[in-house]
Design a protein with these regions (language model features):
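A generic secondary-structure micro-motif detector
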Residues: 18, 38, 94-95, 175
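Active-site metal-binding core of divalent-cation-utilizing nuclease and nuclease-like domains
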Residues: 31-86, 125-137, 150, 154, ...
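Long, highly charged amphipathic alpha-helices
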Residues: 23-27, 47, 103-107, 184
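Short secondary-structure transition/capping segments
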Residues: 107-115, 163-173
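Nucleic-acid nuclease catalytic cores
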Residues: 88, 92-139
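Interdomain/boundary linker segments immediately adjacent to catalytic/signaling cores
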Residues: 1-35, 135-171
Length: 207
């Protein structure tokens, strides 16, 4: 499978997701109040997992692996928490939540096929919580059109690059983080050293 999860995942309806979110966030607020905002991130996560188990929010899984493959390329992602097989929780200890954090969680939703996630930042004086949601399914992400009228097929390398990117999108779907597609292309070319200066591009006036 192009995208393989290390555990079974069950997408939640919005109502069920918010019900779990309410219970989990109550525990997170309690932990933040008891231990303060400078507790190490790994200890925060341990405490969240322990309290979820005490509250019978099962199963509680941590560091869930998602493996993305194409040909001999493979990349692993690890999700912070999966509670009740469908509640995705990502914890941060940053000065503030940033677009990169939201993009990361959205990427996880695309990879898992889930529709909702909770993103939490524990470092500020008051806990930051954001919902990240998408209506895009894997099927929708694989339904795309390629616009290549301005692409220059002026070499075998250029043709290979276009065909490879399209093959990756067919395998994984569109809208995953750009760095993933870039890493795959670089790997399939033989690595970073071989990739640099390998392609001949059209002059700027033709782009």
């Amino acid at each position: 499978m192009p995208i393989e999860l290390s555990t079974e995942i069950r997408p939640l309806e919005q109502k069920e997701f918010h019900r779990l979110d309410h219970r989990v966030m109550r525990m997170i607020f309690d932990i933040h109040n008891e231990f303060g905002r400078f507790l190490d991130e790994s200890l925060f996560k341990q405490e969240v997992a322990a309290r979820c188990l005490e509250s019978e929010l099962c199963p509680v899984q941590r560091e869930i692996r998602v493996r993305v493959t194409h040909a001999d390329f493979a990349k692993d992602y690890f999700l912070d928490f999966l509670i009740g097989s469908g509640f995705l929780l990502e914890l941060k200890t940053a000065e503030t939540l940033a677009p990169v954090h939201r993009s990361q969680v959205l990427n996880y939703l695309f990879l898992t096929g889930l529709h909702h996630a909770t993103l939490v930042n524990l470092r500020p004086q008051r806990v930051q919580r954001e919902f990240v949601s998408t209506g895009l399914t894997v099927e929708k992400r694989k339904h795309f059109n390629v616009t290549n009228a301005r692409w220059c097929d002026n070499s075998d390398s250029a043709t290979w690059l276009k065909q490879t990117v399209i093959a990756l999108a067919n395998d994984w779907g569109a809208f995953l983080e750009v760095s993933l597609y870039r890493e795959a292309v670089t790997h399939l070319l033989g690595g970073q050293k071989r990739f640099v200066n390998e392609f001949r591009f059209c002059p700027a006036t033709a782009v």
